[in-house]
Amino acid sequence: MTRFLYLIRHGDASPHDGPLSAIGREQAQLAGTRLRPVPLTSICHGPLPRVAQTAAIIAANFPAVPVTVDELAGDYVPPVGDAGPPAPYVGFLANFTPAERVRGSELARAALGRFARAAPEAGDTHELVVTHNFLIGWLVSQALAGPAWRWLGVNQMNAALTVIAYSGTLPPRLLSFNDAAHLPVRLRWTGFPATVTPPSI
């Protein structure tokens, strides 16, 4: 049957690799409120504090839904393919060691097997994954049959919502991307430079 995969990027963190900031906690609370009508069957999150805290705030709205932690929902660098990315991204990827890129590629491919497939159950599932920008970009780009590197530049706001549906009879369907209707403008695009964000939305 159909797996409805709800992807939420963690809230704003301070410092970047630290726990949620006050803004991040507010973003997570609003995301939880937004998701209340969804009949979630599971919640999964990565191991880092900013993701675990975001998931905990959201999960408070779903006391009967099981919550698990999985390194496949963690922060890592997906593959870029044998040909590599376009030139503007080469310098960015140089920030990561060869070992980080190899391990990230392994995790990203495993994540496709874990999350990007039809539900094995007889009925539909509604699964929330609280994760990071790179994994969301990877899952979106692969759902749209993009080249391996195309997760680069597919940016997700903190606590924004992306939904992908997987079934056994259709290609993956991107139902929504980077949906921030639950966030006021002041809470959107936190952490991004003005050069890569649209004004006032």
Predicted regions: what they are:
Residues T2-D70, A99-G104:
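Active-site-proximal alpha-helix that buttresses catalytic centers in soluble enzyme cores
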Residues G11, N133, A180:
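Active-site metal-binding loops of divalent metal-dependent hydrolases
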Residues P15-H16, A59-R117, I201:
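Phosphate-handling substructures
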Residues I57, W138, Q142:
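Active-site signature of alpha/beta-hydrolase-fold catalytic machinery across serine-
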Residues L5, G123-F134:
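Generic beta-sheet signal
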Residues P37-P39, A118-T125:
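Glycine-rich phosphate-binding loop signature in dinucleotide/nucleotide-binding domains
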Residues T2, A64, D75-A87, G123-T125, ...:
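Acidic, low-complexity terminal tails and accessory targeting/binding regions
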Residues S14, R50-A52, Y76-V77, L135-G137:
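Short, active-site-adjacent cap segments at secondary-structure transitions
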